[in-house]
């Protein structure tokens, strides 16, 4: 999922706050800029304050993400290296330095020892768990990946909304599918569902953001039998590389069904856009025309867990983010609404209309449907 940081202008308190993960609670760039200044002031008072270093780095990292920097991949974090260098001078044996040294490497496995050292210093710090999940995915060590996915879930802080959302993504897929994702919230919950609950372990999740690692893509091309292309030779045009990878995976020799999550930007799927069919919270790739309405009915009416869209029994720690993600339900829901309306099936039409209105309201998409669905 592409993280957005566009919010109404607001004035924030001039005090240091613990910077929450941007994937759970995205804030406007002004917030991160102000927090960077506040934490810098704390460091000027005490340059041994590990917590201040942690939040100072995180605020600056999120400023870079929110600024829509054109530099992608690990290189976009080079400008944060000076912060890491200063941390090494002042708090080299801290959890914060070792964890952020790894994080700033952009999943460079030659720096994995820093992540391991951070974990050894404080194995209860939850923010390291996703990094272990990613690192072991790169290493293609599924047993260790699942171990840390379970540790993460056991902490009790994984968003239930994203677990439900990604459960429904998995329910959109045929057996033995390959699913292409792009972000954190459309990938990690899938691995947690597979590891913790054994749900749809037949599905192979491939995050497009990870396919810039030469060894990883080489390993995956052998495992899934699609044509290998070296990302290092395509570094100057990352978008073309991603498109090329999507095309190659779609034509894998194992003939495994291929899907893209709705969270994948269409710029990545341009080469196969005419061969993608909406089947729920994913698009199915098929060279032959398929009856996707029948698949939508089956998936959304028989397999999806949708009650969480209607009622929440407790606060979701990723409330802002999951509400935005839930807007992805609107297109498949409207597709079924149109189908039933044309078929003059009034009860089904009304049921989907009510859910569409509710989801649109909760996700801030009322303007999107106001002229389409009449109250």
Located regions from the model:
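Bacterial Sec-dependent N-terminal signal peptides
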Residues: 1-18
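ER/secretory pathway lumenal C-terminal domains and tails of membrane proteins involved
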Residues: 14-168, 172-175, 195-375
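Short His-Asn-centered micro-motif
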Residues: 180-184, 208
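Phosphate- and divalent-cation-binding pockets in alpha/beta enzyme and binding domains
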Residues: 188-189
């Amino acid at each position: 999922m592409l993280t957005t940081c566009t919010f109404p202008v607001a004035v924030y308190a001039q005090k240091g706050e613990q910077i929450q993960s941007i994937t759970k609670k995205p804030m406007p760039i002004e917030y991160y800029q102000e927090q960077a200044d506040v934490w810098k002031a704390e460091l000027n008072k005490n340059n041994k304050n590990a917590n201040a270093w942690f939040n100072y780095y995180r605020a600056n990292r999120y400023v870079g993400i929110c600024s829509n920097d054109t530099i992608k991949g690990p290189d976009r974090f080079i400008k944060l290296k000076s912060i890491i260098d200063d941390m090494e001078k002042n708090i080299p044996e801290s959890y914060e330095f070792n964890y952020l040294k790894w994080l700033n490497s952009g999943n460079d496995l030659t720096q994995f020892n820093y992540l391991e050292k951070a974990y050894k210093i404080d194995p209860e710090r939850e923010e390291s768990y996703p990094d272990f999940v990613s690192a072991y995915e790169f290493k293609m060590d599924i047993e260790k990946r699942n171990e840390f996915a379970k540790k993460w879930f056991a902490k009790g802080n994984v968003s239930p909304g994203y677990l439900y959302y990604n459960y429904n993504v998995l329910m959109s897929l045929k057996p033995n599918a390959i699913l292409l994702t792009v972000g954190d919230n459309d990938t990690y919950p899938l691995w947690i569902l597979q590891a913790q609950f054994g749900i749809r372990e037949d599905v192979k999740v491939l995050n497009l953001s990870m396919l810039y690692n030469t060894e990883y893509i080489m390993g995956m091309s052998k495992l899934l039998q699609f044509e290998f292309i070296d990302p290092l030779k395509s570094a100057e045009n990352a978008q073309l590389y991603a498109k090329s990878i999507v095309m190659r995976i779609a034509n894998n020799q194992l003939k495994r069904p291929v899907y893209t999550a709705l969270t994948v930007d269409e710029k990545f799927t341009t080469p196969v856009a005419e061969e993608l069919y909406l089947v729920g919270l994913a698009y199915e790739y098929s060279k032959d025309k398929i009856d996707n309405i029948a698949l939508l009915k089956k998936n959304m009416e028989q397999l999806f867990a949708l009650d969480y869209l209607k009622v929440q029994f407790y606060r979701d720690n990723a409330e802002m983010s999951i509400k935005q993600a839930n807007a992805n339900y609107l297109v498949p829901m409207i597709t079924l609404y149109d189908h039933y309306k044309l078929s003059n099936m009034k009860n089904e039409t009304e049921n989907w209309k009510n859910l569409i209105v509710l989801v649109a309201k909760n996700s801030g998409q009322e303007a999107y449907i106001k002229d389409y669905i009449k109250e």
